[in-house]
Amino acid sequence: MKNFDYITNPAKLLTPEIVQMVGSIHEHKGKQELFLEANIDELKTLLEVALIQSTGASNRIEGIFTSDKRLEELVSQKAEPRNRSEQEIAGYREVLATIHESYEYITPRPNIILQLHRDLYSYSQGNIGGTYKNSDNVIAETDAEGHQKARFIPVPAFQTAEAIDELCVRFLEAWEANLIDKLILIPMFILDFLCIHPFNDGNGRMSRLLTLLLFYKAGYIVGKYVSMEMLIEKTKETYYEALQASSVGWYEGENSYEPFVKYYLGIMLKAYNEFESRVEHLKHHNLSKPDRIKVVIDNKVGKITKKEIMELCPDISKVTVERTLTDLVKSGYIAKVGAGPSTGYVRI
């Protein structure tokens, strides 16, 4: 059985780079409360948008898709799921909402993990959720020629319950002891969870839900307002590279958690930077929406895309953004560059 060492292993991760990243996140967390107190009304918009973005992104990473319109309707509970993909999207929304509302009272123990997995599949047919895998699984990768090969072989099905029990016991011991920064401890737990791969399906989505839960419990609630799942989706290749690098030698206890920990610290830093930027833009609510879009463009060095503008101004509709960009191009305020998905705009 794998030994989950959350006492000596974390000490190996205190490299100058990781220590600097952790220190920067602590600084952002210190500002977090000030932002939350000063911008209560504006933050409601960010929360609603992040809920939609997180639900969509985490499912898309696993190849589960629906249209933007249907996604918004499902997350807003204005529609019932029509197919299997939408059932899984609706289930993710349910678990994410539970974590947002009750994270203080949710402790990552085996029975809780099983209940969250059950709820993840609460809209799905059959008894998919709430039980550990009943057959061994393999994490595969496809090479350039289209051939699949095993990248990692997780814990066998018959050892899964014991592995999750031990994982949770050791993690909670380290959490309560508080000898290591939780920013380092949390990604270590998530990596071990993914290496166990306890379910037949839904392991990736469960890992991201547990990540949010644990960061919230540690006081880092930026994921409520900026979708960390979307940031992961945008850097999916780097995510899988870090996961693979940190899983080598996992069974023997010889793996390095450093690549995966650094990846997640980078995601957290990016989330806080975006959070502060979006709050800053929301402060311009006294301006008209076209003028707010101009402020966003003025503050951007180089090219900016329509999608980036909409992410920074989540309360402004797509139609308004498109109309404003068209008007600004016509007036000579900005120039349109590129075509298709790479279309952007630059200040003249």
Model feature map: region roles:
Residues 1-348:
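FIC/Doc superfamily catalytic core
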